[in-house]
Amino acid sequence: MSRAQLTLSSKNYSSWSLRGWLLCRLAGREVDEQMVAMNDPGNRAELLLLSPSVLVPRLTHEGASVWDTLAIAEYLNELYPDKGMYPPDRIARAHCRSISGEIHSGFSNLRSALPMNLKMRHETFPVFSGAKPDIERIETIWQECIERYGGPFLFGTQPTVADAMFAPVTRRFITYNVTLSPVATAYCETISAWPLMQEWITAAAAEPEEMEELEVEF
């Protein structure tokens, strides 16, 4: 079986890179990682030839080039339907797709207010009022899923696409010490203990201490 290539940016800062990588690993795919600095004009020009969006992640596999995290999720699910990327139940599967789409396309105030930085810890950090409805909505999503499907992941005992999509949010909450409900706090702890997340955090810690801020949507 040919290996896939996944184009990524900083593991410390890029939430979209994290999502794409988690999705590949959920599907059981080992990938060759192509790391690019998005603020390097040469890298941007090269990536433009490969991915019209000039964004990461981008998955290259057996002649297919797939960008956008949800497109990557659907592509991998087609290839590996037995890997449990989505819940087996039709209604739960629809729910999983819906909340994955919601985090993919929404919550812009949260993204701006709490950019991902895995190495940083703030004991006190002012969260501007525009981000608070986003935080409340995310807590509601998690609470409903865990109460309905039993946890500790959003759709039961095994992680799904939805957990990959929300994983960077848990790290934002931890970095900025956001006050959360007990259920949301427990979910953040579940994602932190997930072996795949631990692997990513370890790799992020090994990146250079100082990096120019990347020109991607975090």
Where are the language model's segments positioned?
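Short Asp/Glu-rich motifs
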Residues: 43-44, 192, 210-211
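GST-like fold's C-terminal all-alpha helical module
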Residues: 103, 107-196
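Conserved beta-strand edge residues that scaffold enzyme active sites
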Residues: 37-40, 187, 205
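Short, contiguous strand/loop micro-motifs
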Residues: 6-8, 34, 157, 174-175, ...
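Residue-level detector of family-conserved "landmark" positions at structurally sensitive sites
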Residues: 34, 69, 183, 201-202
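Acidic/histidine-enriched, glycine/proline-rich intrinsically disordered or flexible terminal extensions
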Residues: 204-218
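GST-like domain detector, emphasizing the conserved glutathione-binding G-site
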Residues: 1-128
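Tryptophan-centric aromatic hotspots in well-structured domains and transmembrane helices
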Residues: 15-16, 21, 67, 86, ...
